[in-house]
Amino acid sequence: MGAAFRFRIHQHGPAGSPVREAFTPMGPKPGWVRLELKAMALNRLDLWTTEGIPGLSLPLPLTPGCDGAGTLEAVGEGTVLPPGVELGGSVMIAPGLSCGVCPACLRGDDMLCASYGVLGHVCDGTAATHVLVPAANLLPIPGNWSFEQAAAFPLVFLTAWEMLVHKCTLRPGETVLVWGGGSGVGSAAIQLVKALGGRAIAVVGSEAKAMKCWELGAEHALVRGDLKALSSKVRELTGKRGVDIVFEHTGAATWPTSMAVCARGGRIVTCGATTGPETPFNLQALFAKQIQIRGSYMGRREHLWTLLSLLQRNPTNPPFHPVIERVFDLADYAEAQRHLEAGQGFGKVVCKV
């Protein structure tokens, strides 16, 4: 690796506006470590951090990027490393940051910590050759995975697991409508629904993406067009009953349809609002159909260990895997942001370092 560099947001702007800068990596403080990154993965949060979020002040200048994997290069004084993690070893990063000592953290609900934040959003992240993170946020990389796969895994699979398992208690045989099946979190959700015995109906923007959803295990893959026609098709596929769970992250544009296709007593869980945060809300439909609505943000860090244990049960034929659409060089991070914003790919966008 050559000279250290990172991408910085000095003022909010459009996708691709972070600028490359040389820097000298700092040593880690007690409880923290420094990684020499080998790969980082982009998420929608990179774009929102770059563009700015109305009403939210971020600590600029800031290096975006919440997913990453690399080599453990330095350890802060007195720092205890997680199981399977050692100096010089290959590790990936759990992106959620919390205080570790409040009641929520102590009972394992770290994403409910009052100081909870995400790497690359509240402190410098992984769009860099090196990054500082708490030691508790490290996990060993499965032996047969590349750094690119490891970087693409944590945020989307942790988010999807929290939504399906802990917010909605997905049961075998239940049907889940997955909006944006070609996104990172959508492609993770399709695989987890199948692995947990559910039936996924994916919604995507093209026939090519629909084919890839089927390959991941979706029972049906619908090309989004007219939303009323889509709603009718979903009800047809479910015997007019509707779906048990709606996996929402698209927001305002799809919310009325999510309400319409949700079965009586069904659940809608949301982790995002890509098309906007405000939408008309039919309270009568909510109580008449007894729909349960649940918000979800990231997930419990310990559940990444649960996901790793599921992978280790069958390493030659894993039940799920990160889907990577394209790999850029880190030097082309700005271009990678613009590519992600265009939304034409299927799966995760990754930068190798």
Question: Where do the PLM segments sit?
Answer:
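NAD(P)H dinucleotide-binding glycine-rich loop of Rossmann-like/cofactor-binding domains
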Residues: 97-180
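N-terminal Rossmann NAD(P)H-binding glycine-rich loop of SDR-like oxidoreductase domains
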Residues: 182, 190
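Adenosine-nucleotide cofactor-binding segment
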Residues: 178, 194-254
